[in-house]
Structures are given as structure tokens and as C-alpha cells.
Regions:
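Class I Rossmann-like S-adenosyl-L-methionine
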Residues: 1-225
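SAM-dependent Rossmann-like transferase core, predominantly class I methyltransferases
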Residues: 220-245
Length: 245
């Protein structure tokens, strides 16, 4: 199984069955169905697509002609999000590969929509530099929500606590780290974040504590062999999802 197909299947289970993303990715990584070099890409695709969901939906909606985007089958929307994430946020993935793999997934899981998915993704390739977001002066909540993919409720809370400029700086910092680090959520039922960090320090594993989540830690590189992950002492979960729990 490829990282893209595994990511698609996980995203569907998360949406349909309400599975927690950290538990879903943990089960998939433990199953051993992915080659070792695909594990990191799989994790990035799942969490990246979830983390950028609001932005991806905002961008994809006007590109869909005929059937309104919200009325598309869930399977089609997930394929579009997964592919659009690669086109917009994964610089090392060639656009042609993102489009072709998205169409191939659609042929396998929703064959009737393959031509539409192909058209939408190719249009996104052509128009991605012309994407227009809401004006921050006119509607700061809508701008922050769609540009940074944060719920309107959290945007209102952040704005009331720190103001627009500081809110932007914070969200920029969080998003900048998302593609560099793998974010883990410490299982505080078993140990504290401080205890978890001490374990990493003893083995010389570099890490950073998350800025907003009190239970998160960021690590560089492939974490699939991390002892603590295998022991259930932590889960892969992006910081935005940790805040939503």
C-alpha cells in the first residue's frame, strides 16, 4: 500500500467513524503495511490534510462546477483535499504526481468522479497563484479562519486575547513548524510531558515543546521507530487537533 492510499483510507475512517486521528495513525503505523520510507509521508498527508481542511475546502469550493462542493460524496471531497494539500503545501511532491495519484485513487474508490477530480486538480494547478482570501480588515475572523485553517471560534478567542497582529504572528509560527517537525501528543495518563522530555534528553533526541498545547512535543525526522510511540506513551497528533480536544 502507498502512503497516499493509506492516508486516504485513514481520512475516510476519521470522517465516517469519528476516529481520533492520533489513534488512527498509530494503528496504521503499527500494522506494518507501509514501507518504512512511506510512513513519514503518510503521517504528513493525514495530519496536513486535517490541519489545512478549512483552507482546502475554501479553495476547492469555487473550482467545482456542476455539483456544489459540499454536496460531493465524502470520498471525492477527501481525495480532492488530499491532492490539493500536496499541490499547495508539499513542495517536494511534483504537481503531476499529486494530480495523477489523486485521479488514480478516484478511479479505484469513486470511478464515476475521476474526470471531475482531474479537471478540478488541473484547474487548481493553473490558478493556485491567484487564490484570493477574505480581506482581513473587513472580516478578520473569516480571514484568519480560511487562511490559517483555524475554527472561527478559536479565532475569536485568540483575537480577544491578543489582538490581530499577535494572533497572526502566533499562527504563522505554528504553521511554519508543521512541515518541519512531527508533532506528538504525550499520553498524560501514563506520564507527564516533563517526564516524556527527560526520556528523550537521556537518549540525545532533539525536540521542542509545542507553543500552545501543554501536552505536545515536536521531533524532527522519522518517529515511527520511537520507543515511546510503540509503548503507547505518545501519539502522533498535530497541535491544532490537540487544542480541539
Amino acid at each position: 500500500m502507498t502512503a497516499r492510499e493509506a492516508a486516504y483510507r485513514s481520512l475516510i475512517r476519521i470522517e465516517k467513524e469519528g476516529r481520533y486521528s492520533n489513534l488512527e495513525t498509530d494503528v496504521t503505523l503499527r500494522a506494518g503495511e507501509l514501507p518504512e520510507n512511506e510512513g513519514r509521508l503518510y503521517t504528513r498527508l493525514v495530519y496536513g490534510t486535517i490541519e489545512r481542511k478549512l483552507t482546502l475546502d475554501y479553495i476547492l469550493a469555487p473550482l467545482c462546477v456542476g455539483i456544489p462542493y459540499p454536496k460531493l460524496d465524502l470520498e471525492v471531497r477527501v481525495i480532492l483535499r488530499l491532492s490539493a494539500y500536496q499541490l499547495l503545501y508539499a513542495d517536494r511532491i511534483p504537481s503531476s504526481a499529486a494530480v495523477n495519484e489523486g485521479v488514480n485513487l478516484c478511479k479505484r474508490y469513486r470511478k464515476s468522479a475521476a474526470s471531475m477530480v482531474n479537471a478540478v486538480l488541473r484547474r487548481l494547478c493553473r490558478e493556485k497563484k491567484q487564490i484570493v482570501f477574505p480581506e482581513p480588515e473587513a472580516d478578520p475572523v473569516l480571514y484568519l479562519s480560511t487562511f490559517y485553517s483555524v475554527s472561527p471560534e478559536l479565532c475569536r478567542l485568540f483575537l480577544s486575547d491578543m489582538g490581530f497582529a499577535e494572533c497572526v504572528r502566533m499562527l504563522e509560527a505554528v504553521n511554519a513548524q508543521a512541515g518541519v517537525f512531527t508533532t506528538l501528543r504525550v499520553n498524560t495518563l501514563k506520564l507527564s510531558r516533563e517526564e516524556f522530555c527527560k526520556r528523550l534528553e537521556k537518549r540525545g533526541i532533539p525536540f521542542e515543546k509545542t507553543v500552545l498545547s501543554p501536552t505536545g512535543v515536536r521531533l524532527k525526522g522519522n518517529v515511527t521507530r520511537l520507543e515511546e510511540l510503540k509503548e503507547g506513551l505518545c501519539f502522533v497528533q498535530d497541535e491544532a487537533s490537540q487544542l480541539a480536544v
